[in-house]
């Protein structure tokens, strides 16, 4: 069975080809675009604009937003500990509500670096629930299993960081935050076990399992080497953070004087299978090596601003030939996962000043739509036509309310793409189509009852907090620890850790 969508404007390949008026997109039963052709007349009903769906190449599938947890305004190094303040609850509820929020805002491909485990069921069962949520919501996810074996409190051994924390909270901080190392082979085996379970459930088309080393400073060299070998053997993608903050840059220079990117290359991790989140403080020669090896960089503009990490050198990444993709990292500017607004913010910050053009619209669209699916699905599985509205491409589409965007129309000659870049936001999304299937219509996710899921999630979370007599004390401890860490990092950029 085929379906068709008529639109007033089609942006088939934004930046590479012009806007086309009065077009019909026909979608085949295989979930791919069968044809794109003029309608010959204006479509009846409300005017619509069709464009490729967006991708989020770095995120964590977080349940609650930063300010809900009291984490707003903190740098990453203290912000991290606030993420554990919400109690673990049903992982399906957590994932389905988070994924629904992303999908409503135009994201068809979503990277989930799963660093916040709910822990109310065995890990494999939790992962299966997350994959089931992706299927029910209708989004495609990359599911990177978080892997680490050191440094639970900072960028060095816990006993090095702990003396900077006030004495009365050290025991509780140690009990809750100290890393309990798991052997590299055991961590790698868990990834394989999860992949097997998700495939057996029939959800592999919605969840691509990946290795997710959290970062070099949180993973020992033996663990990173084991991941590199496993990725080479299986072809499985790898997703990790790199050089997100100034303190991570200082740590890297102290601990890898030969270069942290060269270190990744030397151990076989820097390959086309790798996505590196952030690289805010990467240097030109490091970016050149990343480009040469074919890895992808996921740039998270709002998150880097919100966590006071810096502004990524996106223009330099492009100049060096890096493949770059847009990430939201659970930290979009208004805490709403609005991918269209995130794209506009990145465009505003990175395109250049005055008459200088350091990023083209075509490159922007590669960043926002074409390159992200590769990070989510893996280099071997990504469709070369992703992020385009052309025959044969996956039918992953946004249908926007053109009446709402073009609400004060005066001049017929204006480029609709420029109006999109100036104004479009999540509120203008009339429909989201993934794989030829309508999954969002008029702001409502069709596969699940999102309001009911959110209500159930909040009820369970509030009940768990009320039943935990230590919850308030732990929140106070986290706030105290955040105060104590500031002087530590200001005194020594890498917390005195080697």
Task: Give residue spans per PLM region.
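N-terminal metal-binding scaffold of metallo-dependent hydrolase/deaminase domains
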Residues: 1-41, 49-50, 496
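Histidine-centered catalytic micro-motifs
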Residues: 52-64, 237-244
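His/Asp/Glu-enriched, well-ordered alpha-helical/loop segment
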Residues: 266-273, 315-404
